[in-house]
């Protein structure tokens, strides 16, 4: 019986290179040798383009006119090798090919439907999905399901690859997980105390109402208070969404804890649950003016030499998130004009604020106070360019 090596040698001699490579590709596909299959497809592309079959490690020169089709051939070879592995549910083998060409979507679609069966498989899938960025939300979901909230909090705090939207999606999962845990434990506690199981649809706020003294007797907490504090602080980065409303309820719960269990935060969130509750409610449109005044006073009273600029950063960011661009620019000019932009965190810079406002005069004024001639000149130029646009907007042609 002819072995594959003899068969390939005969094909090269009698049928030519193309026939031999076609046979090679079929053989490697049957063996599910994904790496070999990929390189065989690349070899086929090299022959198609008239390039040498053997590529020296140090001589990878490809003529300029062939560079694009050769690159496309490599990308298609990676897709085919990756898809072959995905067809066998071998995500670990498929992912390097899709990662190489920066096309995670097909792997993400498979990960969305997968459920780890063994601890080792779970670890591998979390590594690919979360830490290597194939599908961060799904990977974080597995961390919550298989390793628990404590590990999920640590993972979120340490960071992982992905977009800002990926982090927001993971944060939403984290808030919901803690909320659901708290709600389940409240229901269980109340069922034992009262002999009646509260409706499953009850919210945390509804479960607390009228039971504050009994539920929090003896310095009791229904969830790990470090988990509660961490998740509430993370929720600062949420947009207006349902999970932000859940964070409000987490704050309401936290406010009832014994003071020993309420860990103080950094300004302007010294009273963690009280201050974050005001912040979240303001974002959600509840008692907005009172909420803004709360944080304005904290920015006004903060001594940058003692506590830094964070109270002002929070206040300016809150104004901007509420769409109050003019007030945000004015607050920035008052409190952050001399702040190092590197300390702004997620607060918009004066450049961004002026751009959204369509008025660059505040940038000019701040640049002069900072002694920045470049920003001063750039602001003047941009202000001059913005004037015709504003005039045209104010007097549209019929």
PLM region spans:
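Long, low-complexity, acidic Ser/Pro- and Gly-enriched intrinsically disordered regions
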Residues: 1-99, 105-106, 111-398
């Amino acid at each position: 019986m002819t072995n594959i090596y003899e068969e390939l040698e005969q094909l090269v001699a009698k049928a030519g290179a193309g026939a031999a490579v076609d046979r090679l590709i079929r053989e490697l596909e049957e063996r599910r040798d994904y790496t070999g299959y990929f390189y065989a497809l690349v070899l086929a592309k090299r022959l198609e383009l008239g390039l040498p079959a053997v590529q020296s490690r140090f001589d990878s020169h490809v003529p300029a006119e062939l560079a694009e089709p050769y690159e496309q051939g490599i990308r298609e070879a990676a897709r085919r090798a990756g898809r072959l592995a995905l067809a066998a549910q071998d995500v670990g083998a498929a992912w390097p090919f899709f990662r190489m060409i920066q096309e995670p979507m097909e792997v993400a679609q498979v990960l969305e439907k997968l459920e780890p069966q063994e601890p080792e498989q779970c670890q591998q899938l979390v590594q690919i999905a979360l830490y290597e960025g194939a599908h961060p939300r799904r990977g974080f979901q597995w961390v919550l399901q298989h390793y628990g909230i404590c590990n999920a909090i640590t993972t979120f705090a340490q960071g992982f690859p992905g977009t800002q939207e990926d982090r927001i999606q993971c944060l939403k999962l984290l808030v919901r997980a803690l909320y659901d845990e708290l709600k389940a434990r409240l229901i269980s506690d109340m069922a034992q105390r009262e002999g009646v199981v509260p409706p499953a649809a009850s919210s945390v706020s509804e479960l607390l109402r009228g039971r504050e003294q009994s539920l929090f007797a003896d310095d009791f907490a229904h969830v790990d208070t470090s988990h509660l504090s961490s998740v509430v602080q993370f929720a600062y980065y949420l947009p207006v969404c349902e999970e932000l409303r859940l964070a409000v309820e987490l704050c309401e719960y936290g406010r009832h804890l014994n003071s020993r269990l309420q860990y103080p935060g950094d300004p302007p969130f010294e009273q963690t649950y009280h201050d974050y509750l005001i912040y979240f409610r303001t974002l959600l449109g509840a008692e907005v003016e009172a909420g803004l005044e709360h944080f304005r006073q904290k920015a006004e009273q903060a001594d940058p030499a003692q506590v830094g600029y964070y109270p002002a950063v929070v206040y300016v960011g809150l104004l901007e998130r509420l769409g109050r661009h003019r007030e945000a620019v004015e607050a920035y000019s008052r409190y952050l004009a001399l702040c190092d932009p590197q300390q702004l965190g997620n607060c918009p810079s004066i450049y961004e604020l002026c751009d959204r406002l369509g008025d660059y005069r505040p940038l000019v004024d701040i640049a002069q106070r900072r002694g920045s001639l470049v920003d001063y000149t750039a602001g003047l130029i941009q202000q001059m360019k913005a004037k015709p646009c504003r005039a045209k907007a104010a007097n549209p042609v019929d």
